[in-house]
Regions:
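One-carbon transfer enzymes
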Residues: 1-177
């Protein structure tokens, strides 16, 4: 599920450990979402669903037999994750539990942190409060701005999100056997 440019989505689709055929659907919630072009480029079915219509999302996910939901730059809080038909994971630009919610990068800079990073975690009822699956650290350089640090964190996300997805897929396979 995406809200923005779709770079994390495309990174998942093109990653060597990813079987593109396993990416069955991309749901987006902004009509001018850049991820739409990326989904079309890779032949991934995509569908607009308002973030206010979680019932429609659930209906689509069930119809497409989705086994894992990945929030790749989906900038809306899932109100009732327990109602979804499968696990949901999210990538967040901080080393959780620090700096939950919006403005995590700005908070890390303002608090003069030396290191920040990103976390992939399960989504639960608490905002950015689910079990952490994987984290990656990014040093904060003295010259870093919100923009430069955000880009550095995104590069780290590109490395850890596919690894976290593979980890979760293996867990799901073990549970099924």
């Amino acid at each position: 599920m995406c809200s923005g440019n779709g770079t994390n989505f495309e990174n998942i689709v093109t990653h060597p450990n990813c079987n593109k055929d396993e990416v069955v659907l991309m749901i987006y919630n902004k009509k001018k979402c850049g991820a739409v072009k990326r989904a079309a480029k890779w032949g991934i079915p995509h569908c607009y669903v308002s973030h206010k219509d979680e019932d429609r999302m659930i209906e689509l996910l069930k119809a497409w037999n989705v086994e894992l939901i990945i929030l790749a730059g989906y900038m809306i809080v899932i109100k009732n994750p327990a109602a979804f038909p499968c696990p949901i994971i999210n990538v967040h630009p901080s080393l959780l539990p620090k700096y939950k919610g919006l403005h995590a990068v700005e908070q890390a800079i303002n608090n003069k942190e030396l290191v920040t990073g990103c976390s992939v975690h399960y989504v639960n009822e608490e905002l950015d409060g689910g079990e952490v699956i994987m984290q990656g650290e990014v040093p904060i350089l003295p010259e870093d701005t919100i923009k430069s640090l955000t880009k550095a964190i995104q590069r780290k996300e590109y490395a850890i999100l596919p690894a976290a997805i593979e980890h979760v897929k293996q867990q799901l396979l073990q549970q099924a056997s």
